Amino acid sequence: MVVTATRLDRLSEAVERALPEGTELVEARFSRGPLLTLLVDREGGPVDHEFCARIISIVAPALEEEGYSGMIEVSSPGIERPLTRPSHFRRFIGRRVRVRVGEPVDGRRNFTGVIERVADAGFVLRLSEDGEEVELPFGSVTRAHLKEDLDK
């Protein structure tokens, strides 16, 4: 069976090819219908309004080549940035995250804790509530993001 990339996958790949060096596409998603939202990060500088406007002008032609002519929104991933790739989990070892998995692990789907270790197939999370460790495979993660304690 031949698996074809989804429209969002194709658009994401076009964006990644067009982005300047040192800029990362953290997440792409359709928001509010035809609005394509791109969360981007970059090395050595802020993701401010000027940078986002520049990214739109860079990626718009690449998206048009893929047949997308809708609206584009570019923004920073924020302080509770999504973790969408294994490399993100590696980068944030030692940081607190919130993770949702598709199939229950140890009878639950939602976890909050600190990333302890990362392997090729998954990662180990030290749970906030009891300090226990749970191993979660990357393939089971449906949503994950940094969890900042804003009360400190």
UniProtKB/Swiss-Prot annotation:
GO biological process, one term: ribosomal small subunit assembly
Gene3D superfamilies per the UniProt record, alphabetical: Ribosome maturation factor RimP, C-terminal domain (2.30.30.180), RimP-like superfamily, N-terminal (3.30.300.70)
Subcellular location: Cytoplasm
Keyword Cytoplasm appears in the UniProt entry: yes
Keyword Chloroplast belongs to the record: no
A cellular component annotation (GO) from this entry: cytosol
SUPFAM superfamilies, alphabetized: YhbC-like, C-terminal domain, YhbC-like, N-terminal domain
Entry function: Required for maturation of 30S ribosomal subunits.
Family to which the UniProt record says this protein belongs: Belongs to the RimP family.
PANTHER family linked to this entry: RIBOSOME MATURATION FACTOR RIMP
Protein name: Ribosome maturation factor RimP
Organism: Rubrobacter xylanophilus (strain DSM 9941 / JCM 11954 / NBRC 16129 / PRD-1)
Lineage of origin: Bacteria, Bacillati, Actinomycetota, Rubrobacteria, Rubrobacterales
Name of encoding gene: rimP
